[in-house]
Amino acid sequence: MSDLKCPFSGHTGAVTASAHTGNRQWWPIQIDLGLLHQHHPASNPLGDTFDYPAAFAGLDLEALKADLAALMTDSQDWWPADWGHYGGLFIRMAWHSAGTYRGADGRGGAGHGNQRFAPLNSWPDNTNLDKARRLLWPLKRKYGNAISWADLIILSGNVALESMGFRTFGFAGGRTDIWQPEEDVFWGKETEWLSDERHTTEGALDQPLAAVEMGLVYVNPEGPHGHPDPVASGPDVRDTFARMGMTMEETVALVAGGHTFGKCHGAAPVSQLEAEPEGAELHQQGLGWHNRFESGKGEHTITSGIEGAWKPHPTRWDQGYFEMMFTYEWELTKSPAGAWQWVAKDVKPEHMIPDAHVPGRASAPIMTTADLSLRHDPLMEPVARRFHQDQDAFADAFARAWFKLTHRDLGPRALYLGADVPEEIQIWQDPVPALDHPLIGAVEIKALKQKLLATGCSVGALVATAWGAASTFRGSDRRGGANGGRIRFQPQNTWEVNDPEQLRSVLQTLETVQQQFNAEATGGQRVSMADLIVLAGSAAVEQAAAAGGHSVTVPFLPGRMDASADQTDTASFNLLKPIADGFRNWQRSGLPLRAEECLVDRAQQLGLSAPEMTVLLAGLRVLGANNGGNRQGVLTDRVGVLSNDFCVNLLDMSIRWSPTSEAMEGYIGRDAQGSERWTASRADLVFGSNSQLRAIVEVYAQDDGASRFVSDFVQAWVKVMNLDRFDVR
């Protein structure tokens, strides 16, 4: 008798991870358009009408913080608290939730509670944080939808710090939960935990990664590749934190501040641990790392494999971390789990640390190799010495750095919720001035459109400028966008993708229009450059549609304000610099990525669906918005007219495409007589090659598709122009 099989999946009773052969296994180089459709509203049990800011407004935040403070010392038998206080555990949970953020692509971080899902919930560096979340469950149950998991995780870290005597900088709610794993985040190409295939032969870490090994949030605490060398660990620590957007001072403050509390756990070899949560047996109900050693908890806990605490009072804010670091010499040893660590030599009795669970037992302070890099690294050591000598400076630096760490990916201050939001504005928040003048209305908008279209700027130039401003937006950390008008400043006005010469000319023209309007306007009305850039692009779209026989009005929402150069962190904004923009048919030379992959990544950051990506690219091509005026993918003889020509001509079966080089980055399309008709990039031809994208293109290329194309383009255009308008949501 044959094995029984599931009629839907074809699985037999013995299910393995590879039991089903999907399309990606058959065709591994196929682009993954599923990235554009993850987190569908149907996956959200709260529905797409749930208003989290409104729910949070009804939260009794002070009552929740009081309950969290009580939880800190409410030790549970199933997972006893170290020294009767869960503070260290909750700080680690919050830290590791936020610490996955990386500035290169804005992904990771605490913004959506992704620590609840694979792969993060099963990373080796997150061992036993599943217990921390289970400890929070009674409070999540009590307060329900008024607090998201994402907010609760970070708030618990804040309350943990405060309950042990530290004064935090503040807290903002506003993080919304996701309900499935994030598929768009590249965590590395390794296939084994704690392995490293992410460094070049010169030792440089691949972009956009920040952690040094698969399954780590930061660095290997035992040292680079497990070698206990504090000097060699220093560059790893500095680079990893810098890739999160942290300065040297913030790096030292975070390491020292975080390790002021709690302890490491390595009572026995990690081989005593069973599978992580995602691999745990069904009856373990999502709890991973079942510990077979003795009681499996308390004094027998195994987490990182390192064993011990850093300072004599692990549940109190003080200078103990630096005092231990600079008072003692350190001896290399191994923990009971076999992990490299350092133990203080000749410890004074008053510096012996009481055991977290066994009365009468004490041990010497420990440091990890990464900790000692603060003492031995020539760049971090002076900062650590200064903090050792100035407790107030250390406390202030840690408070600010902790707030930055836990709020970096929350987005602009307009998204901050709650009574604990600090008033002080930080430059890393990409501040935009508050609206301080009456807005232009329909009459003024109409008049401005006429003036903008009469300037002599081409449709393509106006569209490209607006697109360049708005398309910097990243949904991952909600940075970028047109608001603030920062395309006027460095670094954006020098990026190759923005055609600096054309951009300079367009901006000068728009500034003239702005100055004239603001000087002549009555009633105090003014228009910002940020608004004018978007309005000019939208007016150009209307004119292009009219030229094709379609009368449309592109919705425009005024209210953007202009930031100043002083409000713009040049180095931080340079992280938004695209490596490719398929919508403008530009890609950095020498990039080892396929143009179509970069296009999908950019579309995902813009929150676009596959149809929206398709109609935007096709429309931008015919509008003439390509970088540098290049003709790749401009499959029309009517440049500047909003039409479905790109779609129609891409599907023309009389055209034969062939690559221009072995690299297969550029293509020539020839007609039946062999004459060159078109040129294209990979970002163009993927819309005819990929079956899903081709199906979408067919809809727009149909005889009845022209009006739909224009309508859908306008809708997608407005969506991108308003991605950062959190001030009106």
Swiss-Prot record:
What's this protein's name? Catalase-peroxidase
Q: Where is this site: Transition state stabilizer?
A: R92
Q: Does the keyword ATP-binding apply?
A: no
- Provide the species name: Synechococcus sp. (strain CC9605)
Q: Which residues form the active site?
A: H96
Pfam families attached to this UniProt entry: peroxidase
Q: Where is this cross-link: Tryptophyl-tyrosyl-methioninium (Tyr-Met) (with W-95)?
A: Y218-M244
Taxon lineage = Bacteria, Bacillati, Cyanobacteriota, Cyanophyceae, Synechococcales
Q: For the cross-link Tryptophyl-tyrosyl-methioninium (Trp-Tyr) (with M-244), list the residue numbers.
A: W95-Y218
